[in-house]
Amino acid sequence: MQNIQNFIAGQWISGDGPGQPLMHAITGEQFATVSSKGLDFQGMFDFARDKGNKSLRKMTFQERALMLKALALYLMDRKEKYYEVSYKTGATRVDSWVDIEGGIGNLFANASLRRKLPNQPFCIDGEYAPLSKEGSFIGQHILVPKLGVALHINAFNFPVWGMLEKVAVNLLAGMPAIVKPAAITSYLTEVVFRDIIESGLLPAGALQLVTGSAHNLIDFVNEQDVVTFTGSADTGRLLKRHENIIEHAVPFNMEADSLNCCILGSDAVFGTPEFDLFIKEVKREVTTKAGQKCTAIRRIIVPENMVEDVSYHLTEALSQVMIGDTKHKNVRMGALVGKGQVEEVKGKVVQLLKDSELVYGLDELILVGDNTQNGSFMGPVLLRATNTEADSRVHDIEAFGPVSTIIGYKDIDHAIELANRGKGSLVSSIVTYDDAIATQYTLGAAPYHGRIMVLNRDCAKESTGHGSPMPLLTHGGPGRAGGGEEMGGLRGIKHYMQRCAVQGSPTTLTEITQVYQPGGKYKEPSKHPFRLHFEELTVGDTLITHKRTITETDIVNFANVSWDHFYAHTDVTSLDGTIFTE
């Protein structure tokens, strides 16, 4: 029996007691236990702050980014091992690709941001602000790494991506992290985490891991720490109200599951490419990861006169999905993460049926594979709303599995109203070839959504899909979705850094920021700057030459010396028709 361990203060440690049993989602067999009982959580935070933080904040953005790139390459070389373990979660190869290579892709994406960052441990934020008449007193914002640790409390559905999409950002920002995956799939997180540590690429204390229950982890955070949470809205709200979070004003970034929707434009009737794209997109979002995605389509909002067409074609599409052992080449949908999750989803379906009717599903499953009878399987369920008003359960209850509800709308304004009745969602999409409809919907629904995807025939081939958050775009949403925001390229690192407004003379702020500030004193180097090596140059070095008139002969001579006859224009006729004159 495998024992899933925790990584604390540089050591792999097992928790006390028998631990929580971990079951194979496909076969239903127990293969491991996990426990975090008896761990020294205070010691974890102290080690992260004393060792990890001090090391990371001394590194420049360039060094941190290159560290991420090296780690991404290291993990990519070992990805097949992760796919094999991911099978136990009930995932197909495609499901696992999103989790594993999608997660590693976040490391690559954040590493690429080094092109926009200085070779310093900190950076400026925005333009300088002139604060005086003569220019002798100015202001400039800077971003410096916080002195604490990021505590990442993650969901069960993406044990690799959920970890890497967060740690890529905090490590680039110069802040260590304690990763707390959901226990039920922590075995996959542990496998990847072991390779991260064995790579030797990260300084001591940069990352630590708690695989079992979180217990009282939040009791140990302080005002220099950051807490991120991904999971159910109920649990997130409970943690957000924690006395320690409130007392120390600890930043709490919450990304909760939401009632995401996909809209079918009134122009996308049966027979158009957009109708086919809509059916394909909804089918994929219902079945990928067996519907266990925080971004999955929960509400299918279509014109009232197309409800029957959509119901028929979605039923046909879902009925063709083969379910079972994901090692079988024909299987397109695997198991839910555990039997408890199956029961919870079925319970939510019962509640949803009070405001809807069954279109497809809940039949006895025909599973592919010999050893699947004890697995955590559930087939796709398609409902049709009978009550679409604000008090309808379809706008309030989320079944976190392969379940979605069709809702009819009267016009685009009604579609916007229905979408916004989700009270805040991570993502919405609209499938239409009418840009006027797309514009009206986007502007009307944006206040209630963190991301909106517009899909049509022009972009479908390269579209990343409704359910895929991208590293360089923000991920999060208002209201029910948690009110948080993560990733988003350079926006993401700011959550782990302190913005400080610095005021003073331009010369002093030039030295502090290592960026020349308008009005700062010039420095005269001991010799011509062209004779200095790069490392000998300092910000503010200036060469003041005698005034002279540049002649055509000078330009011709320069072109001949540099062999630049393209940018150094020497032909007067090339100025014809331009705003320039001789």
How should these model regions be labeled?
Residues 1-135, 320, 337, 346:
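N-terminal Rossmann-like NAD(P)+-binding subdomain of aldehyde/semialdehyde dehydrogenases
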Residues 28, 64, 174, 207, ...:
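Residue-level signal for inorganic ion chemistry
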Residues 30-37, 52-57, 131, 151-152, ...:
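Short, well-ordered beta-strand elements within core beta-sheets of diverse protein domains
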Residues 80, 105, 109-119, 129, ...:
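Non-catalytic terminal extensions of PLP-dependent enzymes
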Residues 102, 367-381, 412-505:
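C-terminal core of ALDH-fold dehydrogenases
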Residues 118-277, 409, 462, 484:
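Rossmann-like NAD(P) dinucleotide-binding subdomain of oxidoreductase/dehydrogenase enzymes
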Residues 195, 199-200, 224-226, 234-390, ...:
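ALDH superfamily catalytic-core signature
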Residues 525-582:
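Hot-dog-fold acyl-thioester-processing enzymes
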